[in-house]
Swiss-Prot record:
Shows a pseudo-dimeric U-pillow-shaped architecture of the SLFN13 N'-domain that may clamp base-paired RNAs. The keyword Cytoplasm applies. Belongs to the Schlafen family. Subgroup III subfamily. It comes from Mus musculus (Mouse). This is Schlafen family member 9. GO terms for molecular function: ATP binding; endonuclease activity; metal ion binding. Residues 1-354 are annotated as: N'-domain region.
Amino acid sequence: METYLSLVVKRSYPDLIIYAGEVTLGEKVRNKKDSKKRKLEKTRITQAACALLNSGGGVIVIQMANQSEQPERMGQDLETSLRNLIPSLDLQAFFETKQQEDKFYIFVKSWSSSPEDDSTKPRICSLGTSLYCRSLTSKVAMDSRDAFYFLKKKKAYIKCSPTDDRAPPAKIPRTMSQKSLESNPAFEIFQSKKLEYGQRLLFSESTSIEFKQFDTENAQKYMKDIIPEYISAFANTQGGYLFIGVDDKSIILGCPKDNVDPDSLKIVANEAISKLPVFHFCSSKDKNKVSYETRVIDVFQEGNLYGYLCVIKVEPFCCAVFSEAPISWMVDKEKGVYTLNTEEWVRMMVDVGPEAASNDLSRDFECQLSLSDSPPHCRPVYSKKGLEHKVDLQQRLFQVSPDCLKYTPESLWSELCSQHERLEDLVKQQIRSFSCGLLILSRSWAVDLNLEEKQEVICDALLIAQNSPPILYTILGEQDEQGQDYCTRTAFTLKQKLVNTGGYTGRVCVMTKVLCLSSQNNNKTSGGSVSPIDYPSSYNLANIQEMQGLLQALVIVLLNFRSFLSDQLGCEVLNLLTAQQYEILSKSLRKTRELFVHGLPGSGKTIIAMKIMEKIRNTFHCETDRILYICENQPLRDFIQAKNICQAVTRKTFMNYKFKTERFQHIIIDEAQNFRTEDGNWYEKAKGITRGMKNCPGILWIFLDYFQTSHLQESGLPDFSLQYPKEELTQVVRNADKIAEFLQQELQKIRDNPPCSIPQESLNILHEFKWSQGVSGTYEITYLTLEKMVSYITDKCDVFLSKGYSPQDIAVLFSTDREKKAYEHMFLREMRKRRRASHMNDESVCHSNMFDSIRRFSGLERSIVFGINPIATEQPISHNLLLCLASRAMKHLYILYLSTPEGQSSMVAC
């Protein structure tokens, strides 16, 4: 990564602002300027523009070198350089300009491919790709679109290549290419020991042959300049020969011996080729090698050595060879303006989303944000079918009405006004000129955006109004020098996330204003709008449709979380919280220090637990070792610990007298219905820790589902009537339709005949049960002998693995840990036997992590779940055990019961 010190990123603005220094503007004046200085100015502007296009948009600030009271145009060369960056002939599609006194501003909108344009555009902006190919007798530089299709084609070929991980896909075509190059008429010359000056070759230039001639003293420099582009072109096409010392009439002239020596020719060629950047989509071990051979052949004239002919034979490359790193820039406030390396550039260029990786994706999920029409940093956003779309979520959470300015959430607005006497008048005075839009209040917009809270802030209010850009108001009780920094940082993060996470493709900036309750004149405080840049009117939200578009991006910003699909598809995918989940997550932690969250199976309790720990960290400025997560079983503990957001332990470890709790201030408890008191009163211990600091007690949130209780012992939870305050999660978001139907049946059976250890009133939550319908799946119950069960599961796993599923998508769950230890080896042996028979690496397709007990797997999920003889040792919780098993399966559920040796007919529930 190379940074550019000549371009300064200003940090005190709520936008990306790049100061490009002094630049002469105006067509006539620029034409009179020294050409080298003019080129340097153009380079700075081009780099800054490209960096902003790729980073969410922003502003280039130019100090005008030539003073002029009349508005100046940039100059034709600058306009052309900007136009060359974008996929549109309309410069104003991405750039607007404005002159204010001696400053000239270029307002840059984020790069994106227009959804109205059916043609696929590259994901990022580049000045040059550094990729070349051969076209007839020419070397052709690929533009961004050509490079996109070239890389996409290479990636698709590698994916479909019938080779395994031990042999790169290049092996198959390389043999053919070798024969092709050797049958080329140039091969005979390549094999020669000596040639005659003036000899005419019996072949001419073609797609696989290029002639170059030079006899100057700068021969080595000339070679260094031409080799990278020609080697890239041959390697990216079908291979070929580069002759250095032959003119375009096929006559051998050579390089005079007085100007070069044979060893230096080879050294120059080898050094130039060794520096070429390459990118592999395949598993080639020769990660940085272009396959080539250099020959230096003596050229004689009338029997005397005259000079040398240099020939480079290049084989076709399996993936992509560049002449140098692609020419593209990005910017952020920490790094400044910097270049992308080759690997970063390629991965962004071919980042076309997960659609091609899964046939089930469009069948089971709705796309909320596609990469095809989004800014470069966006990740795809999907929601399970049947869940609310971002449009519905926006209407529910942030509805805009014509000719109406609403405050939301109303409950928070009322609460804040009752707590702070001058607040209502102060806010209304600021927004009185707006008649249509929303004022979205939060105790801390910083925390909502995963930044640290500032305790002196009473609240933040985001104004989304017609004929105005978004404005973030930060309201303080007393004057605070750091208030403006907080507001600016929060507004900048919001603007960046609206574009780079929410996928907003319009022009956007977030203005800032800090208000102080103790000040009589907020227009003269440090809270006045800090941005001296006067943005064009195109940054105003012109109508309700534009406001709704921005608010839908805001929904994605606030409700997104990393999806389980990310690991399955091999690329990061985001999901959205439900409105019900978001409402719980939005609670004020300072007001809700203890909370019981009752959630039905698959309603997202663990997701909320993880999100709330992130919120705790930002609200209370605490390190991860101050937050403790407690669950009953080790697999869930390990899953949470890997997230690096807290310290995760099991209940047993927590209750061990050797376990030190002094540093912990906040505790999150998950799957609490399966806790026990055999090692002591865990609830009182947790409460004692979180209440240890009387002036600032910690957070204690407990997540549970009585329906999934897997034992009859005392749980240690307080009486149901004392579990206050409490919230409920009733929308099942995990399971396919057939599995959800089975869950509902089992829930009802438990509701009708609950175990004595479960409070009857806790089961009334079932009345609110609902699931997001529309996802197909499998639910089967089968009776088999143990031997047939092993074959059945192995067959099914073979089918799923052949369809692209991985072992991480599969769980085989036994009733008890003892049964798992007794029978696991039988399944593994059969699976490995099958894999060896098919000559596949058995370690990569089956391992012991696929096997566990139903109880230990609590809180986790898999796409495919096999339940082995799920019979509870304690009859009253038999339906609870089935429920625990079934709720782990997202897509396919197979329940297999042991039949008698005599056999029993299979029963399949469809």
